[in-house]
């Protein structure tokens, strides 16, 4: 059973980063940094597939094995892959420090082999008042992505 994972984020533009995942009890700690972003919030999600053959688009929708509507990371109604937003500073750097009780590195909610995506816009956490909000949080385009793999 994997207890650690890593993801290298890359895209067509300047956005890049490294994200690490570590299982701690019944939660997963997500840490790392992303550079090349515009200042402000950016949606941050685990997507269904580990397929990046057509860039980040082929990663599919948010990882949602429970068939729920999109929400924030602290919401009862959320996709497993809904990790909310990362916040970039004026230098375009986002420091990631998330503890999530729903994602896992093993079992039915395992994110191993799936794609981590950082988005162009803020995630409205499903509160945008339209259909797209309940699917994607209106987070916009996919700036960078990478497949989550087992780490030593």
UniProtKB/Swiss-Prot annotation:
Gene coding for it: SOD1
EC number assigned by the record: 1.15.1.1
Subunit structure: Homodimer; non-disulfide-linked. Heterodimer with SOD1. The heterodimer CCS:SOD1 interacts with SLC31A1; this heterotrimer is Cu(1+)-mediated and its maintenance is regulated through SOD1 activation.
Binding positions (Cu cation): 45, 47, 62, 119
GO CC terms, sorted: axon cytoplasm; cytoplasmic vesicle; cytosol; dendrite cytoplasm; extracellular space; mitochondrion; neuronal cell body; nucleoplasm
Family: Belongs to the Cu-Zn superoxide dismutase family.
Lipid linkage positions (S-palmitoyl cysteine): 7
Residues recorded with modification N-acetylalanine: 2
Needed co-factor(s): Cu cation; Zn(2+)
Any GO BP: negative regulation of developmental process
Cofactor info, note text: Binds 1 copper ion per subunit. Binds 1 zinc ion per subunit.
PTM (free text): Palmitoylation helps nuclear targeting and decreases catalytic activity. Succinylation, adjacent to copper catalytic site, probably inhibits activity. Desuccinylation by SIRT5 enhances activity.
Subcellular location, record wording: Cytoplasm; Nucleus
Record GO terms (molecular function): copper ion binding; protein homodimerization activity; protein phosphatase 2B binding; protein-folding chaperone binding; small GTPase binding; superoxide dismutase activity; zinc ion binding
Residues binding Zn(2+): 62, 70, 79, 82
Disulfide bonds: 56-145
Pfam families in the record: Sod_Cu (PF00080)
UniProt entry keywords in alphabetical sequence: Acetylation, Antioxidant, Copper, Cytoplasm, Disulfide bond, Lipoprotein, Metal-binding, Nucleus, Oxidoreductase, Palmitate, Phosphoprotein, Zinc
Role this protein plays: Destroys radicals which are normally produced within the cells and which are toxic to biological systems.
Organism encoding this protein: Ovis aries
Modified positions (Phosphoserine) in chain numbering: 104, 106
Positions where N6-succinyllysine occurs in the chain: 4, 10, 90, 121, 135
Reactions catalysed according to its record: 2 superoxide + 2 H(+) = H2O2 + O2
Name the record gives this protein: Superoxide dismutase [Cu-Zn]
Region entry Disordered, spans: 53-78
Matching InterPro entries: SOD-like_Cu/Zn_dom_sf, SOD_Cu/Zn_/chaperone, SOD_Cu/Zn_BS, SOD_Cu_Zn_dom
């Amino acid at each position: 059973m994997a207890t650690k994972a890593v993801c290298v984020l890359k895209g067509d533009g300047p956005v890049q980063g490294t994200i690490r995942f570590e299982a701690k009890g019944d939660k997963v700690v997500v840490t790392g940094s992303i550079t090349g972003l515009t200042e402000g919030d950016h949606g941050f999600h685990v997507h269904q597939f580990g397929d990046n053959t057509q860039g980040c688009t082929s990663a599919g929708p948010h990882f949602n094995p429970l068939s729920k509507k999109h929400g924030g990371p602290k919401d009862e109604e959320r996709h497993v892959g809904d990790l909310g937003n990362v916040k970039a500073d004026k230098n375009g750097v986002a420091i990631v420090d998330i503890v999530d009780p729903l994602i896992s590195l093993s079992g039915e909610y395992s994110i191993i082999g799936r794609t981590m995506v950082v988005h162009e816009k803020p995630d409205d956490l499903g509160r945008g008042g339209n259909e797209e909000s309940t699917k994607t949080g209106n987070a916009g385009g996919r700036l960078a992505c990478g497949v989550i793999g087992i780490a030593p």
